[in-house]
Amino acid sequence: MDATGELDTVEFINIAKDDVFMNPSHKYPAPIEREMVTIVKPFVQKSLEVNQTILDIFNDKLGLPEGTLLEQHPLHEHSGSEARIIKNPPMPHDAHKRAIGAHTDFGSLVSFLE
């Protein structure tokens, strides 16, 4: 709810990469738990493959020794990486009203898929 009392329309769920590939430390809603292996894990795996390709390109363009950036992102070690799913229903256009306000993303890479 904002200062005027208007309710939020945006829903978020964050799924930790560690929970996808290792023992989950969080309990997720039933639909996520049910589809963790068939939908969530393949999605996260493909996203990581895309990010690894981008890191390889950056690594090459920066003239770093091969694998330098990937070494900073080991797959099976604790990480702060997560998949975030955002649900926001269509709204009438209002240039002064945004569903997701200004914010800072964290980490090495952020992939946005719509």
Regions found by a protein language model. Give the residues of each.
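Peripheral, non-catalytic segments flanking oxidoreductase cores
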Residues: M1-E114
